[in-house]
Curated annotation (Swiss-Prot):
Residues 1-19 form the signal peptide. Its main location: secreted. One of its GO terms (cellular component) is extracellular region. It comes from the Eukaryota. GO terms for molecular function: beta-mannosidase activity. Homodimer. Glycans are attached at residues 41, 81, 94, 249, 261, 284, 289, 318, 348, 538, 551, 609, 624, 632, 659, 739, 791. This is Beta-mannosidase A. Its EC number is 3.2.1.25. It is found in: Secreted. Pathway: Glycan metabolism; N-glycan degradation. Keywords: Carbohydrate metabolism, Glycoprotein, Glycosidase, Hydrolase, Polysaccharide degradation, Secreted, Signal.
Length: 932
């Protein structure tokens, strides 16, 4: 057993800057900690912040939780209670007015004791907790030890579910993945399993904690700050008037006491240059329920605007808020922010818009600083099953990959955790809008008073915490409740539908909506991620927002869409894709690379249908705690198999590991092409009657090494999908739309720029050896075009049967666009290029030719040069070895014979001392057909 030291904890620099009477802030993470449990026959070192699995891993008690089938093998950890115990706390001030414990996050069911006296119990992972322990400190006669006992979340929610007073829902409504009853807890819902991740149900002090001592009665500690910047007169659900001055509303949450004559002032300066924008006093000061609030109208200030990536600069400002009593500073807080308006437009289509060709219905698109724009991006899931080990460095790499793929928005999927501030900081700096959601998904939830009160505190804290970030784009109530759960109830239990609509409105409209509106003027709220929008908003009505639900009119378009179709036979039939105003979820799963599999799976299990590979695939989920989910997972594996077999060469390599790797790559090819087909379709919709202005695919990244919908693997390696996203999210693209039934090919140019763009598209038919087809198959070699702002235009249409193609199986059409135009908020004209291709048959039926790819590396320029010597190289793929994290600036492209492509590798981490370069390889679709 570890003998505790007599710890004297260090005093931190105060978060409340005041030279006269700072509180003393002690970082509890500086203490020594131990971890114990009845399930463990010894005590091991603990840490804060941390989680139980991580401390057991550090102590050598368990293997890597991500290894093999440890998500099953380590369930004993989630089933046990665990206690974190501090070393005795010495050095606390004796002449203090009050002493407080502040926890930024406890996961989840925790009992807190100090000096063997119970202080409090908690039941919400997402809340900040502050407890006055002044009396416990003064009365302490035993060892001044802090203990945090974490109960087993799976067992506790099972007990809640078994209580006769707890709500019960009809069969088939609540979606379980592994552990049941997740809806009874305010904890990361995916901790109990999801179809892309494991169910570890972790516990522990997952965020920092502090002990704070106030030296006098008029002394405060800042807990949270709500900085709201908006246009004067702005209302959440209406478009802001861009001619109005900026308003700054500052609200500081604190404990302690402020004099009634307290004043507030602000100083705003540019973050980069330090240039002062303005300083002024706030008006209408109120002190109520532990918050001090004031407002200022910035009439004479002209800040530079903050814009999303690709639309302008990310101008940032530091706002310093000072609270004083007229003589001295009592509190001072600095927040970095930006000046922008962001608005989700759900208003009805006007007669003028209908006359311009927009289909009737309602809008569903975002506007930034008064401008419509096309939202290009993906869905962010939890980056790790254990948040305590998520680092700023790794997330910076992830966000760098987001903007490298030309994405300007991420939907932060509900039922993970609210993102930490540092991730919003990264988004602020890079121009990534974060559509944020409250943590509810794919289930109905309790609506009793205790549950609602708990949620209310969670909502208020998190809305206020992140409101200053210009990257914050939206608050949504939850995931797929309106689009999936309520319709399921209506179909299966129509007599109970009204009751559950009422429960839905109680939580997402009556409770959450007013709390959002009370704490921010600048952000729109939508009760559900996928929704048909609202009929009306009336702030004085009993139900403030009247949702449209299924009150739809034929021929009208409303709301956003999600789309999952695992029948791969229709994957590239774009008539199957939903027509709507915005696509917020769509996708298909694929395997990670061999390099990622090797991080978690033993060599003997590296084949497509091994038990380990199959059981790490959670699509389809077991729906319970079964460890032999072969029936459901085989359906998911079968879908990926059919996606390959229907369209691509089937790998059949002699070496089993090489064959497994080729199969993994093949599933990624299908996934990437399927997403490309959909994104092209949705982007084309910007110029169609639906006026479609957003596509966010499912999903950005992996939580672990397993089959999933991700485009970025767990360690940061890009799948084929992310390279395709980088390509197809360029500002101006050329896209082929092929109808295999009518044999008609339409070629479109789509632009998301804010002004018309003109240019040309080159159309070049050739056979797969690279030889041009005679007379270019009766196709014009060049087509000129003009495409309107945020629009699309058809530049050519042909029937393949009428083309002079000697053999469709030996034909490829290369499409190359070159356009001139201004990027948003740029005075400089840019040349914009993009290349696409089309084959009249699917890749599996092509008469492929070995392109004899040659790869060279120039150490001086740090570039790779790829050349096809003998044939057309389709899906040209550069791959790098393990030990490196980064991405190629281009990948998955087409090369024609004689063409060279110079490609730089963007290094994010190198553990090979530069030796990785020797193991970079290149392959093409041809290599999928070979035995070696």
């Amino acid at each position: 057993m570890r003998v505790p030291a007599q710890a004297t904890i260090a005093v931190l620099a105060s978060a409340v800057s005041s030279p006269l009477n700072d509180p003393q802030i002690y970082d509890l993470g500086k203490l020594g900690w131990t971890l114990s449990s009845p399930a463990l026959n010894r005590t091991v070192p603990g840490h804060l912040p941390s989680q139980v699995h991580l401390d057991l891993l550090r102590a050598g008690v368990i293997d890597d939780p991500y290894h093999d089938l440890n998500d099953f093998n380590l369930r004993w950890i989630a089933d046990a209670n665990w206690t974190y115990t501090s070393d005795p706390i010495r050095g606390l001030g004796n002449n203090t007015h009050s002493t407080w414990l502040v926890f930024e996050g406890l996961d989840t069911f925790a009992t807190i004791k100090y000096c063997d006296k119970q202080i409090a119990s908690t039941n919400n992972q997402f809340r900040q907790y502050a407890f006055d322990i002044s009396e416990a400190v003064k009365d302490c006669t035993a060892d001044p030890v802090l203990s945090l006992n974490f109960g087993s979340a799976p067992k506790i929610v099972d007990q809640i579910a078994a209580d006769p007073a707890s709500p019960q829902w009809p069969f088939g409504i609540q979606q379980s993945y592994e552990y049941p009853n997740r809806w009874f807890m305010r904890k990361e819902q995916s901790d109990f399993g999801w179809d892309w991740g494991p169910a570890f149900a972790p516990a522990g002090p997952w965020k920092p904690a502090y002990l704070v001592q106030l030296s006098s009665e008029q002394n405060v500690h800042v807990l949270n700050t709500d900085l709201d910047i908006y246009r004067q007169g702005q209302i959440n659900y209406l478009p802001p008037d861009q001619t109005q001055p900026w308003v700054l509303n500052a609200s500081i949450d604190f404990f302690g006491s402020l004099p009634s004559n307290s004043s507030m002032s602000i100083a705003i300066s540019e973050t980069n240059s330090g240039a002062e924008l303005t300083t002024q006093s706030l008006r209408n000061i109120t002190i109520l329920n532990g918050s001090i609030t004031g407002v200022a109208v910035l009439k004479d200030a002209s800040p530079k605007l903050w814009w999303p990536y690709g639309l302008g600069e990310q101008n940032l400002y530091n706002v310093t808020i000072t609270v004083s009593d007229g003589v001295r500073s009592l509190a001072r807080v600095t927040k970095r922010t930006g000046f922008r308006t962001i608005f989700l437009n759900q208003r009805n289509i006007t007669d003028t818009e209908i006359a311009q060709g927009v289909a009737p219905g309602a809008h569903w698109n975002f506007e930034v600083n008064g401008h419509e724009f096309y939202a290009k991006g993906s869905n962010l899931i939890p980056p790790d099953a254990f948040w305590a080990r998520v680092t700023t460095t790794k997330m910076a790499r992830l966000f760098d990959s987001v903007v490298a793929a030309n994405q300007n928005m991420l939907r932060v999927w509900s039922s993970g955790a609210y993102l930490p501030d540092f991730m919003y900081d990264l988004a602020d700096e890079r121009g990534v809008l974060l559509w944020s959601e409250f943590e509810f998904s794919d289930a109905m939830y309790p609506v009793d008073k205790a549950f609602l009160d708990n949620v209310a505190a969670e909502v208020v804290y998190n809305v206020r915490r992140v409101n200053h970030h210009p990257s914050l784009a939206l608050w949504a109530g939850g995931n797929e409740i309106e689009s999936l759960i309520l319709p399921t109830i209506e179909r299966s239990y129509p007599d109970q539908y009204a009751k559950y609509v009422g429960d839905y409105e109680t939580l997402y409209i009556n409770l959450i909506l007013p709390l959002v509106y009370e704490n921010t003027h600048s952000i729109t709220y939508s009760p559900s991620s996928t929704t048909e929008g609202y009929l009306d908003v009336n702030l004085s009505a009993k139900i403030v927002m009247a949702e449209r639900y299924q009150n739809l009119t034929e021929g009208h378009y409303y709301g956003d869409t999600d789309y999952y179709n695992y029948d791969t036979s229709v994957a590239f039939d774009f008539s199957q894709y939903p027509v709507g105003r915005f696509a917020n979820e769509f996708g298909f799963h694929s395997m990670p690379s061999l390099q990622s599999w090797q991080q978690a799976v033993d060599p003997e299990d590296l084949h497509f249908n091994s038990s380990v590979i199959m059981l790490r695939n959670h699509h389809y989920p077991a729906g319970n705690l079964s460890t032999h989910n072969f029936h459901n997972t085989s359906m998911g594996m079968g879908e990926t198999t059919m996606g390959v077999m229907n369209y691509y060469p089937v790998p059949d390599k002699t070496d089993p590991i090489a064959n497994f790797s080729a199969w993994c790559h093949a599933t990624q090819l299908f996934q990437a092409d399927f997403y490309k087909s959909q994104i092209q379709f949705y982007r084309r919709g910007s110029g169609m009657p639906e006026r479609q202005l957003g596509s966010l695919y499912w999903q950005l990244e992996d939580i672990w090494q397993a089959p999933s919908w991700a485009g970025i693997e767990y360690d940061g390696r890009w799948k084929v999908l992310h390279y395709v996203a980088r390509d197809i999210y360029q500002p101006v693209i050329v896209s082929p739309f092929w109808n295999s039934t009518t044999r008609r090919l339409d070629v479109y140019v789509t632009s998301d720029l804010w002004e018309p763009v003109s240019g040309t598209v080159d159309l070049a038919w050739m056979d797969l050896s690279g030889k041009p087809i005679a007379q270019n198959a009766r196709t014009p070699k060049t087509a000129a075009f003009v495409v309107g702002a945020l629009n699309t235009t058809k530049i050519y249409s042909m029937n393949i049967n009428e083309r002079a193609l000697p053999d469709p199986k030996n034909s490829v059409l290369i499409l190359s666009v070159q356009a001139e135009g201004h990027l948003p908020n740029s005075n400089k004209k840019s040349t914009l290029t993009h290349q696409g291709h089309f084959t009249p048959v699917f890749p599996k039926d092509l008469m492929l030719v070995d392109p004899h790819l040659e790869l060279r590396y120039n150490a001086k320029t740090l570039t790779f040069t790829v050349q096809a010597k003998a044939g057309v190289s389709l899906y040209t793929w550069l791959d790098y070895p393990a030990g490196v994290v980064g991405y190629f600036e281009d990948n998955g492209f087409v090369l024609v014979p004689g063409q060279k492509r110079d490609i730089r590798f963007v290094m994010q981490e190198d553990k090979t001392d530069g030796n990785w370069v020797q193991d970079v390889t290149v392959r093409s679709l041809w290599d999928q057909t070979t035995k070696t």
